[in-house]
Amino acid sequence: MSRVCELTGVSVQSGHNVSHSQRKTKRKFLPNLQNVSLFSDSLKKAFKFKVVARAMRTLDKVGGLDCYLLSASDKTLSKSAIEVKKIIKNNESKS
């Protein structure tokens, strides 16, 4: 089970814990992943994604799942998100 956001591509980062005496020990910075069902306005259907909390704020700012997916590049999206994006594009072209 990977720790990667399906919409933004944010993943685990590595770094150091630094003590007062400046000793450095390795650590991991884990993303704040949440399992969320996001509603598509054009498809009238909900989709489940594993998303970072910051991405949920971005979705609210942009105007929802449909607007975000259509404006996002395919490099950052997961395979399931790309499939949803294609379905939304096809649905908009039909109507």
Curated annotation (Swiss-Prot):
**Organism per entry:** Orientia tsutsugamushi (strain Ikeda) (Rickettsia tsutsugamushi)
**Keyword Ribosomal protein set for record:** yes
Which gene produces this protein? rpmB
Q: Which family does it belong to?
A: Belongs to the bacterial ribosomal protein bL28 family.
Record-linked InterPro entries: Ribosomal_bL28 (IPR026569), Ribosomal_bL28/bL31-like_sf (IPR034704), Ribosomal_bL28_bact-type (IPR001383), Ribosomal_bL28_sf (IPR037147)
Q: Which UniProt keywords apply?
A: Ribonucleoprotein, Ribosomal protein
Note whether Heme occurs among the keywords.
Answer: no
* Protein name in UniProt: Large ribosomal subunit protein bL28
One Pfam family from the UniProt entry?
Ribosomal_L28
Q: Which GO terms describe its cellular component?
A: cytosolic large ribosomal subunit
